[in-house]
Amino acid sequence: MAKKSAIEKNNRRKALAARYAAKRAQLKAAAMDENLSLEERFKARLKLAELPRNSAPNRVRNRCEITGRPRAFYRKLKMSRIALREYGSRGQVPGLVKSSW
């Protein structure tokens, strides 16, 4: 089980990323728009830099929904390899059969 503080920090990052997503997209579009003057584009970049760092979506870490483990994460199932193996052995993952020989 991961530290609760790390899981909560990641949840805060998810919330911040969702809250600032529209504003960030608007500023990025303005910064990349070649029809605007260089000065306006630069202002958009400065505004983008003023946003909280944790509002960037790439700072959000994929974590297992069950254990909170940050590594060996299966996106499709939203769980780590360890949780997947455990749940698969119990037959709780539809379509998954754990092989044994």
From Swiss-Prot:
One of its GO terms (biological process) is translation. The keyword Lipid biosynthesis does not apply. Keywords: Ribonucleoprotein, Ribosomal protein, RNA-binding, rRNA-binding. One of its GO terms (cellular component) is cytoplasm. Gene3D superfamilies: 1.10.287.1480. SUPFAM superfamilies: Glucocorticoid receptor-like (DNA-binding domain). The keyword Metal-binding does not apply. InterPro entries: Ribosomal_uS14 (IPR001209), Ribosomal_uS14_bac/plastid (IPR023036), Ribosomal_uS14_CS (IPR018271). GO terms for molecular function: rRNA binding; structural constituent of ribosome. PANTHER family: 30S RIBOSOMAL PROTEIN S14, SMALL RIBOSOMAL SUBUNIT PROTEIN US14M. Part of the 30S ribosomal subunit. Contacts proteins S3 and S10. NCBIfam families: PRK08881.1. Binds 16S rRNA, required for the assembly of 30S particles and may also be responsible for determining the conformation of the 16S rRNA at the A site. Belongs to the universal ribosomal protein uS14 family. This is Small ribosomal subunit protein uS14. It comes from Hyphomonas neptunium (strain ATCC 15444). The gene is rpsN.
